[in-house]
């Protein structure tokens, strides 16, 4: 145990009231989490992280060592997705197919409540749930949908539909995100991917990761935002542990590929997740395969689908925690700190929330240290 702790610069173990599937940054000092228990009311909380974890310089001794509840609210439904509307105090949540999307207002500093202000209808069919994405715009808007042919853009204030993507097919959606304020990326569970312009109907380009017809394999993706003259890059991971990096301008041709020996296949698509590190070049993180989070450096990858080793694996949830039924916890969500290079937050099914920063380690590509 002591040897494992030496691998970290920082490792903080917090206990939430219940497990969460969402970890959403609100600014760079607080996060939103929400419960997903279908048998009871769930909390939606905005938590201020300790000063040591958001200070840009070493603050020395800090009196606050725990998470502090800034705002909170209750919902009668499980929360599967939560997104903050940029430059606003609004958040949007989605849950099971039978539930609407909820729009919430985070109260001002003198009020500690998160209160619902409106709902949007969900189009989710049986066995699916609505994915959501937000972007900066003059008027708050949300992109939402559960299937490729049902994705739409809605104005939050008026609740009026602004645009329908107009893409054919009932493929279940796993990932929705904006490349910019007008361009949308969609990844479907079966590996189908497309780019669409919200000003025009239909897909501008389309491709697929993985082999068509493998219904047992689920894919999800994350997009690394473009910077200056560097184009966006899509990272995709499958429930069997395959990864592909692609250029959004040509989704059918992988630039880099990898596979790794997963401890167990992802149990289902609900916890499968991949993220780009916002402040660490070429690094991605993957969770949903048991109680760990894997960090990969993609710099030296090529287009060959071969085994690569992670540069770091956070096993804290499986080592330090146990669920009420005695099973090993599964990581349910993780997110990178917005600007701290190696700092990651991860949540697990036992209600634990870890904030960790790993030490410098030799970077390898799975073939050499």
From Swiss-Prot:
Disulfide bonds: none annotated. SUPFAM superfamilies: WD40 repeat-like. WD repeats lie at residues 74-114, 266-306, 326-366. It is found in: Cytoplasm; Cytoplasm, Cytoskeleton, Spindle; Cytoplasm, Cytoskeleton, Spindle pole; Cleavage furrow. Its main location: cytoplasm. The keyword Amino-acid biosynthesis does not apply. GO terms for biological process: cytoplasmic microtubule organization. One of its GO terms (molecular function) is protein-macromolecule adaptor activity. Keywords: Cytoplasm, Cytoskeleton, Repeat, WD repeat. GO terms for cellular component: cleavage furrow; cytoplasm; cytosol; spindle pole. Component of a multiprotein complex required for the assembly of the RNA endonuclease module of the integrator complex. Associates with ints9 and ints11 in the cytoplasm, stabilizing the ints9-ints11 heterodimer and blocking the active site of ints11. Brat1 then joins the complex and plugs the active site of ints11, leading to wdr73 release and nuclear import of ints9 and ints11. Belongs to the WD repeat WDR73 family. This is Integrator complex assembly factor WDR73. The gene is wdr73.
């Amino acid at each position: 145990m002591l040897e494992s702790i030496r691998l970290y610069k920082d490792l903080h173990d917090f206990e939430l009231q219940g497990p969460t599937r969402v970890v959403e940054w609100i600014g760079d000092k607080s996060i939103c989490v929400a419960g997903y228990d279908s048998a009871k009311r769930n909390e939606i909380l905005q938590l201020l992280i300790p000063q040591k974890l958001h200070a840009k310089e070493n603050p020395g001794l800090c009196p606050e060592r725990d998470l502090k509840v800034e705002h909170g609210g209750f919902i009668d439904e499980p929360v599967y997705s939560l997104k903050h509307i940029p430059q606003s105090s609004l958040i949007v949540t989605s849950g099971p197919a039978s539930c609407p999307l909820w729009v919430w207002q985070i109260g001002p500093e003198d009020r500690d409540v998160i209160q619902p202000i409106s709902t949007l209808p969900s189009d989710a069919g049986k066995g699916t749930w609505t994915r959501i994405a937000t972007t900066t715009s003059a008027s708050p808007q949300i992109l939402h949908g559960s299937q490729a042919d049902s994705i739409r853009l809605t104005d939050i204030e008026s609740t009026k539909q602004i645009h329908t993507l107009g893409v054919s097919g009932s493929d279940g959606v796993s990932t929705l995100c904006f490349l910019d304020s007008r361009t949308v990326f969609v990844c479907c569970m079966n590996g189908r991917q497309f780019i669409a312009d919200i000003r025009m109907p239909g897909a501008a380009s389309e491709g697929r990761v993985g082999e068509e017809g493998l219904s047992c394999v689920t894919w999800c993706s994350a997009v690394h935002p473009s910077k200056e003259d560097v184009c966006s890059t899509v990272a995709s991971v499958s429930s069997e542990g395959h990864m592909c990096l692609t250029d959004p301008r040509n989704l059918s041709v992988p630039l880099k590929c990898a596979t790794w020996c997963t401890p167990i296949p992802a149990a289902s698509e609900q916890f499968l997740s991949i993220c780009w590190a916002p402040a660490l070049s070429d690094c991605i993180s993957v969770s949903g395969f048991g109680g760990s989070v894997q960090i990969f450096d993609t710099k030296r990858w090529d287009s060959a689908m071969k085994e690569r080793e992670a540069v770091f694996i956070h096993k804290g949830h499986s080592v330090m925690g146990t669920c009420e039924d005695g099973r090993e916890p599964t990581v349910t969500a993780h997110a990178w700190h917005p600007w701290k290079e190696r700092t990651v937050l991860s949540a697990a099914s036992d209600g634990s929330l870890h904030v960790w920063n790993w030490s410098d380690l030799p970077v390898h590509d799975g073939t050499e240290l």
